[in-house]
Amino acid sequence: MRLMISVLAICIGASLGALARWRLGLWLNPGAVLPLGTLAANLIGGYLIGICVAVFQALPNLDPVWRLALITGFLGGLTTFSSFSAEVVGMLGQQRYALGFGTAGLHLFGSLLLTLAGIKTATFLIAFNT
């Protein structure tokens, strides 16, 4: 039974994350030189995983199914390393080196900074509410 609950949590989370990424692409990608939908998905995912990391550390007794639903499922469906990689390789293949490497930098450093910001935000809010 526990296995089925875990599978269901991952499936629901992944479906919702993928739908959110799809909507971001529809909203932000049409005609954009830089695929902003993919960037937004990865940056939002970076921030949200930071929040999740801090919350799960602060609440160690929280049912692990939440980690599966939120991190493995939702954030796994929302963020996309493969699309980011294909977009950057496409830019480099078109000899748009500045755009390609700039995009790679935005994804990498932006996600790292927003993950740290998410951890700091959640840590502050947890400390503020205790």
UniProtKB/Swiss-Prot annotation:
Subcellular location: Cell inner membrane
Superkingdom, taxonomy of origin: Bacteria
Principal location: membrane
Activity modulation: Na(+) is not transported, but it plays an essential structural role and its presence is essential for fluoride channel function.
GO terms, biological process: cellular detoxification of fluoride
GO terms assigned for molecular function: fluoride channel activity; metal ion binding
Bilayer topology: Multi-pass membrane protein
Catalytic activity annotation: fluoride(in) = fluoride(out)
Transmembrane feature ranges: 7-27, 36-56, 69-89, 99-119
A cellular component term, taken from the record's GO annotations: plasma membrane
Positions of Na(+) binding: 76, 79
Keywords: Cell inner membrane, Cell membrane, Ion channel, Ion transport, Membrane, Metal-binding, Sodium, Transmembrane, Transmembrane helix, Transport
Similarity section: Belongs to the fluoride channel Fluc/FEX (TC 1.A.43) family.
Function: Fluoride-specific ion channel. Important for reducing fluoride concentration in the cell, thus reducing its toxicity.
Designated name of the protein: Fluoride-specific ion channel FluC
Species whose genome carries this gene: Albidiferax ferrireducens (strain ATCC BAA-621 / DSM 15236 / T118)
Originating gene: fluC
